[in-house]
Amino acid sequence: MTNIRKKHPLLKILNEAFVDLPAPSNISSWWNFGSLLGICLMIQILTGLFLAMHYTSDTSTAFSSVTHICRDVNYGWLIRYMHANGASMFFICLFLHVGRGMYYGSYLFMETWNIGIVLLFAMMATAFMGYVLPWGQMSFWGATVITNLLSAIPYIGTTLVEWIWGGFSVDKATLTRFFAFHFILPFIVTALVVVHLLFLHETGSNNPTGINSDADKIPFHPYYTIKDFLGVLILLTVLMILVLFFPDILGDPDNYTPANPLNTPAHIKPEWYFLFAYAILRSIPNKLGGVLALILSILILAALPLVHTSKQRALTFRPFTQALFWILVANLLILTWIGGQPVEHPFIMIGQAASISYFTIIVILMPMAGVIEDSLLKFTH
């Protein structure tokens, strides 16, 4: 008798995705982040669901309802901080996952990669709207500043902003719709994740050598289920250390002050995981130019397959491009730092230099390095 997991219509799909899936025998811990992102998504949906049971999306009660969750609801403080810090862990895993894809040339799986970019945008939209919900000072002013950027769109900009606000400023209507969108988007993300996996399983996973691994495959279970479980254990340990010992370390103190439209905070800034993009936005003195640069800072990932010049897929055996990759990582850390600094000398200049080098490395230097490496290795184009 054949095992039920291979016969049952539903179990068969799960079996082919998580049990009998042929996986390369040499994928490293950098391939753990996909499953970690899945765990993060599950944590966020569950904690978010329980928060939504006690949260009210009205401007007069939103801040109080979050306070009520932390003080009066059983383990409400735990759920709230798991959700807030879970978002940070989500983005850490996300950045490492994308970085892995860039390093090992996984972007050559075009469909999987492009769905991943759509996922990244959806995640950023979800996180931004979630940050508005507690209705603290940074929630309100962050929402005002970021939504206002749409007014830079020629002709329809102002109308579009007022349409999103549901009025002439960020107010009750804005908060209510942001709550609605914040609730629905994670489920859209989940659907996109399924499509992401569907396309990945069409080709199979890439591996650290960047070479076809069809000749040497092993079953996903038990090898990678146990390996992923270790990753999950580390993720949960780090998350719980954050939640139980340093719950506010990644937040902004301004968000413990209720939203006040008459009082602007000294430095309006988003959550840490958006600071690199915020720095790129601020480095351009023109409003529309800044918005375009902001979008391009993520959308440029879609250009990676187009500017891949090397005959080799991964950076494993390509020292020049490797060096450029790590310079790019350092550059992103500099942008993150600059995004949290006030707009004054010398931060303006550093931000502009880092923004220019960010795009230059990806679009010009890395493709050039690929061509140089090929010629040095006598790979004829």
Curated annotation (Swiss-Prot):
Keywords: Electron transport, Heme, Iron, Membrane, Metal-binding, Mitochondrion, Mitochondrion inner membrane, Respiratory chain, Transmembrane, Transmembrane helix, Transport, Ubiquinone
Family listed: Belongs to the cytochrome b family.
Keyword Heme: yes
UniProt cofactor(s): heme b
Assembly and interaction partners: The cytochrome bc1 complex contains 11 subunits: 3 respiratory subunits (MT-CYB, CYC1 and UQCRFS1), 2 core proteins (UQCRC1 and UQCRC2) and 6 low-molecular weight proteins (UQCRH/QCR6, UQCRB/QCR7, UQCRQ/QCR8, UQCR10/QCR9, UQCR11/QCR10 and a cleavage product of UQCRFS1). This cytochrome bc1 complex then forms a dimer.
Miscellaneous comment as given in the Swiss-Prot or TrEMBL entry: Heme 1 (or BL or b562) is low-potential and absorbs at about 562 nm, and heme 2 (or BH or b566) is high-potential and absorbs at about 566 nm.
Cofactor note: Binds 2 heme b groups non-covalently.
Gene expressing this chain: MT-CYB
GO biological process entries: mitochondrial electron transport, ubiquinol to cytochrome c
PROSITE patterns with a match to the protein in the record: CYTB_CTER (PS51003), CYTB_NTER (PS51002)
Species this chain originates from: Scotinomys xerampelinus
GO CC annotation, single: mitochondrial inner membrane
Gene3D superfamilies for the chain: Cytochrome Bc1 Complex, Chain C (1.20.810.10)
Protein known as: Cytochrome b
Xref: InterPro entries: Cyt_b/b6_C, Cyt_b/b6_C_sf, Cyt_b/b6_N, Cytb/b6-like_sf, Cytochrome_b, Cytochrome_b_C_euk/bac, Cytochrome_b_N_euk/bac, Di-haem_cyt_TM
TM spans (from-to): 33-53, 77-98, 113-133, 178-198, 226-246, 288-308, 320-340, 347-367
